[in-house]
Amino acid sequence: MPAWLSALLAALGGYLLGSIPTGYWVGRCWGGIDLRQAGSGSTGATNVLRTVGKGPALLVLLVDAAKGAAAVALGSALGSPWWVVVAALGAVIGHSRSCWLGFKGGKSVATSLGILLAMAWPVALATFGVWLLGIALTRIVSFSSLLAAVAAPLLMWALGQPLPYLLFALAGGVYVIAAHRRNIERLLAGSEPRIGQKWAQSP
């Protein structure tokens, strides 16, 4: 298969996998709400947790992670770690800019975790450990996700992963941080909700 066709299939396939609007569907079917109009406006698991509940949030987390893992499988099937990276980045972008939701979506954290699990599971576990540490210290999901986004490329390098995967962690980490820009503003203002707070209860 020509390289251009492999790249196209990886990018398009990864994007379409990532764009599956899991949180939106769960919000509609389980809570009768449009997540784009509720809470933070994100369709990710954290907003589902705040606006719908724990069970639906866990479902969204698992399915969104599976989307990322499926993108890695697609890239692997195309025969090169570079196509893995292209498909993975496509999934990250697709989750936050879904063509089914007017190019809106979530923050791509769960999808990125699924990608890391399929790409380099030791890095995924270590990154998840950093996220858990952030939760234990602050109980703020966005802050913990930002810590994990910074840690992922460092852990890729420290654990000797291939260059394509290191570059994914760098690019994906920057993208996830950029997707959290409003959260960063609220963190600086001291108004970001903690776990257990409804959106309206935030300071």
UniProtKB/Swiss-Prot annotation:
Localization, UniProt: Cell inner membrane
Q: In which pathway does it act?
A: Lipid metabolism; phospholipid metabolism
Specify the superkingdom: Bacteria
Has the keyword Cell inner membrane been applied to this entry? yes
Cite the entry's keywords alphabetically.
Answer: Cell inner membrane, Cell membrane, Lipid biosynthesis, Lipid metabolism, Membrane, Phospholipid biosynthesis, Phospholipid metabolism, Transferase, Transmembrane, Transmembrane helix
Q: What EC number(s) is this enzyme filed under?
A: 2.3.1.275
Task: Tell me the membrane topology, using the record's own terms.
Answer: Multi-pass membrane protein
**Transmembrane parts of this sequence:** 1-21, 52-72, 73-93, 115-135, 140-160, 161-181
UniProt-listed InterPro entries? G3P_acylTferase_PlsY
Q: Which Gene Ontology cellular component annotation is one that this UniProt entry carries?
A: plasma membrane
- What Pfam families does the record tag this protein with? G3P_acyltransf
A single Gene Ontology biological process assigned to it is: phospholipid biosynthetic process
Which GO terms fall under molecular function for this chain's record? acyl-phosphate glycerol-3-phosphate acyltransferase activity
Q: Which reaction does it catalyse?
A: an acyl phosphate + sn-glycerol 3-phosphate = a 1-acyl-sn-glycero-3-phosphate + phosphate
Task: Name where it mostly resides.
Answer: membrane
PANTHER family to which the protein is assigned, alphabetical = GLYCEROL-3-PHOSPHATE ACYLTRANSFERASE-RELATED, INNER MEMBRANE PROTEIN YGIH
| HAMAP family the UniProt entry points to | PlsY
Its subunit composition reads:
Probably interacts with PlsX.
| Entry similarity comment | Belongs to the PlsY family.
Briefly state the protein's biological role.
Answer: Catalyzes the transfer of an acyl group from acyl-phosphate (acyl-PO(4)) to glycerol-3-phosphate (G3P) to form lysophosphatidic acid (LPA). This enzyme utilizes acyl-phosphate as fatty acyl donor, but not acyl-CoA or acyl-ACP.
Protein's UniProt name: Glycerol-3-phosphate acyltransferase
The organism named in the record is: Synechococcus sp. (strain JA-3-3Ab)
Recorded name of the encoding gene: plsY
